[in-house]
Curated annotation (Swiss-Prot):
Family named by the database record: Belongs to the UPF0282 family.
Protein name: UPF0282 protein APE_0500.1
PANTHER family the record matches: UPF0173 METAL-DEPENDENT HYDROLASE MJ1163-RELATED, UPF0282 PROTEIN MJ1629
InterPro entries for this protein: RibonucZ/Hydroxyglut_hydro, UPF0173_UPF0282_UlaG_hydrolase, UPF0282_hydrls
Amino acid sequence: MRVEIVAADSLGVRSIATFVEACGYSIGVDLGASIAPRRFSLPPHPRELRRLEQALDRARRRLEESNIAIITHYHYDHYLRDEPELYAGRLLLAKDINRSINRSQRFRGYRFLVKSGLVERGRVEYADSRVFRLEGGLTIEFSKPVWHGEEGTKLGKVLMVRITCEGVSIVFASDVQGPGNNEALEELLKWSKPRPLVLIISGPPLYLGGYRVGMSSVELGIRNLEVLAERLRPKRLVVDHHLVRDPRFPEVLERLRGRAAGAGVEVLTAAEYMGLRPEPLETMRRELWKGEEG
């Protein structure tokens, strides 16, 4: 099984796009990317804009190579919203647009899947709480819809995914933010056997703590990452996305590494997983613009 993180916040864009090769299949998970229109009262730096185009190009290439595409929810950094035609001709496992979904995501999903004609032209399966067993021994399991972070958030719900091939599994928990609620944690802990090769998860949004998200939820997300390290025990725990938007993210990861080491779990950002130095350009936006002034 091969796992490539195509784009992520530690790679310079808002994303957690992932590409998996397993049991003869190529699977694109949440292949999309975006950037914050304003951060620190500043627009995106040209370097961010270039990185976004590069990330979207990689996402398109990986989607074209995929037999299977997965969309865990309909936030714009998780799918190629303006290019539904790229999803035709492959199996698309997507969040149900008719249940356990907020108004915004329902509208986006309807526009993308139904209004575009993709449902009629493509092979679309709503994946909530379902298990797909394919020829060659590939199994793709989906959680029930869980909160996008703290319980009751207006951001709605997302799906988590486990991909298993020949007794080897990976788990993908996009936008659960730690998770920032215990229901999502319990769902993840059900997937402890076989021990995951890698868990790719969005960390808590420290940059929004006490502002748009309660600090109690952020702290719960950090604690739940520690629980996952000790009880789910993935061989590699990739924590990225929302967490990396705060310059304090290395401190959180260092604390997590201290707890995870005893369980034999390696903690990494997406960039580190890919053998690269983290470049969270959104977090660096002030410095990037100051460099222009100099």
